[in-house]
């Protein structure tokens, strides 16, 4: 019923905008722009509604939204278009780890180049979000589908284990204490789990208040080497993962995050960490009451926080300034409070414009869905610095896969945690070296 209610609000907004739209001119007189994206399913439906809403709200620009498949499919097609110097979309959605490629491609226009001429208020986007797409002080892309990791827990299991269902653990030591009570009480077979996922490794480094890569995570100059081996963060993270695994209250479900989610939703596991992107589905579909908490910390650190994931919108350099200005109008429209509220309510992603949370619809939604407020507050409580900006690297997809290959060997005792740090650092450093050579 909740889904129907909020979808009705979204559809109502579209219909109202259509009725209020001025008489349209012929399609031939409109500027027609192409928008490539990777949003399928419900997210794709909500996005198409926003595109239709924009098209109906004015009579100068027509956006043609084109689904490209997965993020990897999208970047592959974009690279092909760049190489052929034809067929570039006017606007392209790109996942977070594609940021360095886009920056280095020379085929994009920084969105900040449009701010002054259009009077756009840069502060309308929360800085903790825009910082991910900011290089040398300039914002290159507009954040769009934004998520972070957080703790999910089964409130029914907590009650059965004698734990306070309103008080989630805040550190991994507390996670272990609660996991022990869950298992020993028989409330659930497994106390805690987290998928083997390189993104979580990056997040836990940020929680420690340290960088993944040198040169301030690549924010002041290009990354030339990792930092996590020399700043001690990498060893602390690997030690923590191994401690969890060896406790007897943890189960490893591998690198496929959906497998860990399935174990949680079936009641086999009391707590997991996962992206806020699954929160809407988790709350709507779980057979038990879901609780949420901040991503646990290895150590409490004022410099620590979470890094955003997800994707952003980029302006491509098509050589047609009029089209580029029109494309910016579409991106600017997407960042408005009402549109961001609709996007967030319809998908579960964060609204990037803080004023979206002040709209009546969003206030009502958050009152009905308090778990979403946990996610929002965690993001707002994260400091804005190079740690939480995340690493700007052209090899992060490869780096995450390498972590995924190394972690099981730590679990099995084939590698010590120090060996794991050394191997991961050596592999990623080599990949960084090769990437930097390739773009000279």
Q: Can you say where each PLM-predicted feature lies in the sequence?
A:
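Hinge/lid segment of periplasmic solute-binding proteins
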Residues: 95-150, 176, 203-207, 291-293, ...
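Short, solvent-exposed loop/beta-turn-alpha elements that line the ligand-binding surface or hinge
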Residues: 112-125, 168-170, 210-236, 284-285, ...
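Glycine-centered hinge/linker elements that transmit conformational signals in sensory
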Residues: 177-181, 220-253
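C-terminal capping/gating helix-and-loop segments adjacent to ligand/active sites or protein-protein/ligand interfaces
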Residues: 307, 373-427
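Short, well-ordered beta-strand elements
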Residues: 29-40, 61-66, 90-91, 140, ...
């Amino acid at each position: 019923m909740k889904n129907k209610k909020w979808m009705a609000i979204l559809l109502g907004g579209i219909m109202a905008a259509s009725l209020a739209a001025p008489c349209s001119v012929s399609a031939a007189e409109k500027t027609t722009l192409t928008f490539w994206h990777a949003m399928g399913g419900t997210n794709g439906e909500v996005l198409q509604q926003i595109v239709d809403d924009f098209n109906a709200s004015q009579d100068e620009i027509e956006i043609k939204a084109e689904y490209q498949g997965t993020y990897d499919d999208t970047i592959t097609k974009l690279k092909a278009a760049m190489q052929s110097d034809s067929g570039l979309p006017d606007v392209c959605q790109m996942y977070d780890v594609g940021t360095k490629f886009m920056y280095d491609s020379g085929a994009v226009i920084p969105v900040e180049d449009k701010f002054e001429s259009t009077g756009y208020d840069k502060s309308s986007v929360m800085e903790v979000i825009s910082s991910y797409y900011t290089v040398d002080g300039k914002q290159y892309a507009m954040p769009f589908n934004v998520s972070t990791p957080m703790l999910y827990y089964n409130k029914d299991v907590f009650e059965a284990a004698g734990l306070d269902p309103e008080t989630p653990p805040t550190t991994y030591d507390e996670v272990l204490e609660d996991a022990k009570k869950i298992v020993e009480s028989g409330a659930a077979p497994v106390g805690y789990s987290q998928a083997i996922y390189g993104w979580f490794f990056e997040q836990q480094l940020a929680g420690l208040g340290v960088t993944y890569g040198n040169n301030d995570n690549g924010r002041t100059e290009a990354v030339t080497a990792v930092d996590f081996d020399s700043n001690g963060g990498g060893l602390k993270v690997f030690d923590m993962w191994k401690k969890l695994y060896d406790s007897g209250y943890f189960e490893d479900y591998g690198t496929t995050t959906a497998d860990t989610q399935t174990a949680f939703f079936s009641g086999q596991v009391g707590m997991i960490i996962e992206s806020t992107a699954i929160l809407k589905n988790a709350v709507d579909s779980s057979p038990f009451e879901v609780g949420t908490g901040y991503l646990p910390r290895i150590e409490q650190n004022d410099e620590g926080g979470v890094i955003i994931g997800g994707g952003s919108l980029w302006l491509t350099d098509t050589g047609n300034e009029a089209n580029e200005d029109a494309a910016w109008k579409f991106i600017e429209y997407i960042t408005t409070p009402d549109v961001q509220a609709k996007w967030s309510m319809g998908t579960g992603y964060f609204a990037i414009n803080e004023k979206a949370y002040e709209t009546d619809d969003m206030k009502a939604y958050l009152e009905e869905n308090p778990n979403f407020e946990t996610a929002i507050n965690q993001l707002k409580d994260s400091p804005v610095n190079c740690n939480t900006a995340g690493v700007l690297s052209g090899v992060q997809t490869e780096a995450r896969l390498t972590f995924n290959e190394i972690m099981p060997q730590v679990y099995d005792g084939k590698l010590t945690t120090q060996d794991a740090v050394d191997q991961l650092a050596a592999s990623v450093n080599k990949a960084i070296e090769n990437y930097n050579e390739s773009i000279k």
